[in-house]
Structures are given as structure tokens and as C-alpha cells.
Amino acid sequence: MNDDDTWVALLHRPADPSVAGGVFADPRFGDHVAFLQRMAEEGYLVAAGSLADRPGEGMTVLRLPGPDRLDEATRLATEDDASVASGFFTVDVRPWRVVMHA
């Protein structure tokens, strides 16, 4: 991968705020984990995890090789993640202009 890669931050939150504290116990959370595993297998996953100050919310960083792949990243996040497609999570797909990384 090079500096022309497409980076995105995916910000996930429960569609129903009442499940925020128990999101990890909900069986639909497994769909989200499966999505993250597929992204790792594709080599796109940089990092993923819950936000310590926001129960039930999380962030995922994806890096897709090549420029101009935001539409593909959006499709992956909204259609390929069954936890989003089913309405369990909402997701904000944010293009990320990375200026420095290790």
C-alpha cells in the first residue's frame, strides 16, 4: 500500500440507544465481528474497537489500496456489515486524510 490509499474511519453506534450498555451481549454483535474479520482477511482493517467514553459506540479504521475507493468503503460498511444492514448499528463513513503514520 502507498500514500495514495483510501483511508476511512467508520463510527458505529447502536441504532437503539437502550442497548448501548449491552451491545456486546446482543447476538447481532456477532455479525459486526464477522464483518471485521472479513476486513482483516482482505487486508483492509487497520484497527477496530469500542470508544471508552461512549458505551456501545466504536470506531474502525480501514485502508483500501489505491485512491478514490470511498464509494467501495461505504458499500462495505453499509451493506457488507450485516449489523448495519439490519439496523442494529448505524455507521458514519468518514474519509480520513492521513498525513503521518508509522
Where are the regions a protein language model picked out?
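Conserved, structured core segments of small domains
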Residues: M1-A102
